């Protein structure tokens, strides 16, 4: 066994010994210490005893929340909304979708005797601490091979995603809309109203929503013999990003018959660029948004949009996670039907 005395213990009056201190002294990972002290996982008896002895000699005491987990449940669900972290602010304009998910999830958690805690999307070393305190996690819009999903799976922590991780759709529990099918339905709506060349404005994040919708757009363009015209913009670019991208497109190429924008803010920006160019919606160009937002409803010409029903997504995610935490046998992959709000931007 490594001699714990080679590790410098905190002096009296300083911060207490942490699980990381134990891991360094025992020359194992933080997750190994957690499994050893909580009698979980598949560690050998020798490893468990070695870690326990190191912890005892250092005087390590588990954090109260970790002790709660050792005896059962903490009664807490963690919610990480990756898309908000990607914007760099939690007060982003157009964040209503995520606020609606979080609000509905909080109420649903309380109804199941759990508390909901919003956490920043962890990265780097902070991943090691994530799995120690919550009974389970909800991750909104994970990207392909998402490191947080990987970390929680490796730690055997229950998780549900809103939208699936594209690299392991069949291996995780999720609630989601069917981006591929609904994108095709919107494109057919536009085609039925006279649009042949449709420009698609998607996000840059490699999540299931963007990837499925883009795949559907390319397939639709191929099936109808039209050249795809795809613009990718970061969601954080908002209305200004949509306005700038469409203004540039109008200067450099033929005006398309319609725009299908993944986000409501991009759609609102596209509408402003069309207006600035002397074009009228819907007379000259049709617009649809793939996610309804206040900007769609208050645009000078209200914009047709898919309502992804974020409250329903939030409630379903909590219900599914609680079922998994409580070891109930339930369907672990659930599709939610969005609603299409027809507005003036597609009236012909």
Please describe what each predicted stretch is.
Residues 46, 60-126:
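Amphipathic helical "hinge" segments at domain boundaries
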Residues 84-88, 92-97, 121-125, 175-185, ...:
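Hinge/beta->alpha junction and helix N-cap segments in small-molecule ligand-binding domains
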Residues 2-6, 12, 229, 252-348:
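Flexible loop/turn connectors
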Residues 143-184, 265, 291-303:
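Flexible loop/hinge segments that line or gate small-molecule binding clefts
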Residues 123-133, 242-254:
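Short, well-structured alpha-helical segments in soluble
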Residues 1-76, 347:
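N-terminal helix-turn-helix DNA-binding module of bacterial transcription factors
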Residues 29, 75, 135, 196-197, ...:
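Short acidic/polar active-site loop segments enriched in Thr and Asp
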């Amino acid at each position: 066994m490594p001699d714990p005395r080679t590790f410098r213990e905190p002096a009296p009056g300083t911060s207490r010994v942490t699980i990381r201190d134990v891991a360094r002294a025992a020359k194992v990972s933080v997750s190994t210490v957690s499994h050893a002290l909580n009698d979980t996982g598949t560690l050998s008896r020798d490893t468990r005893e070695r870690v326990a002895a190191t912890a005892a000699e250092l005087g390590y005491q588990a954090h109260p929340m970790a002790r709660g987990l050792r005896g059962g449940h903490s009664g807490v669900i963690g919610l990480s909304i990756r898309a908000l972290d990607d914007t760099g602010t939690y007060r982003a304009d157009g964040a209503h979708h995520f606020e609606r998910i979080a609000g509905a999830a909080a109420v649903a958690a309380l109804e199941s005797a759990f508390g909901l805690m919003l956490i920043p999307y962890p990265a780097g070393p902070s991943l090691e601490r994530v799995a120690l305190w919550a009974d389970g996690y909800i991750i909104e819009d994970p990207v392909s091979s998402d490191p947080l999903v990987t970390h929680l799976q490796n730690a055997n922590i229950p998780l549900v995603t809103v939208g699936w991780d594209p690299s392991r759709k069949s291996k995780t529990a999720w609630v989601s809309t069917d981006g591929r099918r609904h994108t095709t339905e919107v494109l057919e709506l536009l085609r039925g109203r006279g649009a042949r060349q449709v420009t698609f404005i998607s996000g840059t994040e490699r999540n299931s929503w963007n990837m499925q919708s883009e795949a559907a757009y390319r397939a639709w363009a191929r099936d109808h013999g039209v050249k795809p015209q795809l613009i990718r913009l970061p969601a954080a670019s908002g209305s200004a990003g949509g306005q700038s991208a469409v203004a540039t497109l109008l200067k450099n190429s033929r005006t398309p018959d319609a725009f299908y924008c993944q986000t409501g803010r991009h759609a609102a920006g596209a509408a402003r660029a069309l207006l600035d160019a002397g074009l009228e919606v819907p007379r000259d160009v049709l617009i649809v948004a793939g996610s309804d937002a206040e900007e769609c409803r208050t645009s000078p010409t209200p914009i047709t949009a898919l309502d992804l029903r974020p409250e329903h997504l939030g409630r379903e995610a909590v219900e599914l996670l609680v079922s998994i935490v409580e070891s109930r046998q339930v369907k672990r992959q659930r599709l939610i039907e969005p609603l299409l709000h027809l507005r003036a931007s597609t009236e012909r």
